[in-house]
Amino acid sequence: MKYKIEKNTVQETLILPLYSRKLCTELYPNLYRDETAVHLLDQIDYDFSEAEKNSRSLMQRFGALEVAMRQNDLAWEVRNYLKTHPCAAVVNLGCGLDNTGRACDNGRCKIYNLDFPDVIALRQQLLPAGEREQNIPCDLKDPAWFDKIDASGGAVFFASGVFYYFLTQQVKALVQGMADAFPGGVLVFDAANRTAVKMIAKTWLRTAKIKDVGAYFAVSDAPKEIGEWDSRLQVTSRGYMLGYNDLKDPSVSGFFRFLAKAGDNGMKMQIVKIGFGGKL
């Protein structure tokens, strides 16, 4: 039986990123594979005709490459942390229907997937929690979820495409709260400069009738700007298109490599890594 998704629902906002990850898997098979996305979409009853039509456009194909690189980069950081903290908590902040935690499973870590209650309700149906895994309904801005994470073996948190929708003050409060609660832990997430965030936010800000884009989280020089928030933070960043992969794959055109360089350098598209006291 297929799970029906209606237009203009919260569920729809979760399906479209899944479709992007499936598109990545088809377009760039040497760079990225998300079998979960492919499998889940087979279980869903939804009209993908518009998404399929758009998938042929140049910018949609580049957007799929962006999604692929972002997911790969975050997974690389999670696996890197698990090398020195094999029993750590692996925490997906704003998980949607993303399965990165399970993809990074080393057989010993504890996996937590956090999102709003309506999102987790859908996730429980399509991606029920496995062994050593919990799906936790919460509001990320409310620190009550901190107590649900067993960080006795360390903790690595990651957020994909999440903080663009937070005010700068909200990100700062969350980061400082996490530094208190999870010393020795690491948070990794994608970010971009003000110009890029304005482009990302154009559609949803108009819908939400929000005028002050400048209050939303954006960063150009992460070590300097975020490092000033709290002396306990150890902040580094790498370009998210080319910082982890040179993209010299036959599936990626020279023009897309040019756009990737422009994204990393001009838009400051980056993966930010924050260590909370202790060693990174």
Describe the function of each predicted region.
Residues 157-158:
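A conserved beta-strand element that flanks and buttresses the S-adenosyl-L-methionine
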Residues 143-152:
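Short amphipathic alpha-helix with an adjacent loop that forms part of the alpha/beta core around
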Residues 198-213:
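Short, glycine-/aromatic-enriched active-site segment of Class I SAM-dependent methyltransferases
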Residues 232-258:
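Conserved catalytic loop of SAM-dependent methyltransferase domains
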Residues 1-91, 95-138, 151-152:
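Rossmann-like AdoMet
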Residues 213-240:
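Short alpha-helix
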Residues 165-180:
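A short, conserved alpha-helix within the catalytic core of class I
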Residues 178-194:
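Conserved beta-strand signature within the Rossmann-like core of class I S-adenosyl-L-methionine
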